């Protein structure tokens, strides 16, 4: 019964870490990633569709992305969606593909993006702490219902704290690695 609480807690905390890493993939670092376009939706015959579902997106070099739509009539719609997304670039439509030329980041931009990464890390830590609180509440309820002793409850809460500390450590490492990647010139 306690093991089930531990396993559920670990799973939920792991999901918070995975969500953080997904969020990090949308942040720009020294090299532009195709993931920066993940949140962009294109109007595909009246349905908002992910950009990578209507064409191939590839990185040509550290500052250039190319989008090759599977249907050429989508070029204008893709171009409009990118402009509306306000990601800091103007799409260059050559009639076959759309190229996005990202300017090199200034030191100030790098600091702002690093600050965003830190904020994302804090949000993930809050999610982990909320998971810890939920797990501790379950343990306290078991103790209150006399299903476990007070000693077992204390040990369980200590175990939950260890799981939480591990998750927080992983989040801190992820944030530090992302900040280093962003601030690296």
Swiss-Prot record:
Transmembrane segments: none annotated. Pfam families: RRF. GO terms for cellular component: cytosol. Its main location: cytoplasm. Residues 128-158 are annotated as: Disordered. The keyword Flavoprotein does not apply. It is found in: Cytoplasm. Keywords: Cytoplasm, Protein biosynthesis. NCBIfam families: frr (TIGR00496). Belongs to the RRF family. This is Ribosome-recycling factor. The lineage of its organism: Bacteria, Pseudomonadati, Campylobacterota, Epsilonproteobacteria, Campylobacterales.
């Amino acid at each position: 019964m306690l093991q089930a609480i531990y396993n559920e807690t670990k799973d939920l905390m792991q999901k918070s870490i995975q969500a953080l890493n997904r969020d990090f993939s949308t942040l720009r670092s020294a090299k532009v990633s195709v993931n920066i376009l993940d949140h962009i939706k294109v109007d595909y015959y009246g349905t908002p569709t992910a950009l990578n579902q209507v064409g191939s997106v590839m990185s040509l070099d550290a500052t250039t992305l190319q989008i090759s739509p599977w249907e050429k009539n989508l070029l204008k719609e893709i171009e409009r969606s990118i402009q509306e997304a306000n990601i800091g670039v103007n799409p260059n439509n050559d009639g076959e593909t759309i190229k996005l030329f990202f300017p090199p980041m200034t030191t100030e931009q790098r600091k702002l993006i690093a600050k965003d990464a830190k904020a994302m890390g804090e949000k993930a830590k809050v999610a982990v702490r909320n998971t810890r609180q939920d797990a501790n509440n379950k343990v306290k309820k078991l103790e209150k219902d006399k299903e476990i002793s007070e000693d077992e409850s204390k040990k369980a809460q200590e175990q939950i704290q260890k799981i939480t500390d591990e998750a927080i450590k992983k989040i801190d490492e992820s944030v530090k690695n992302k900040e280093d990647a962003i601030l690296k010139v």
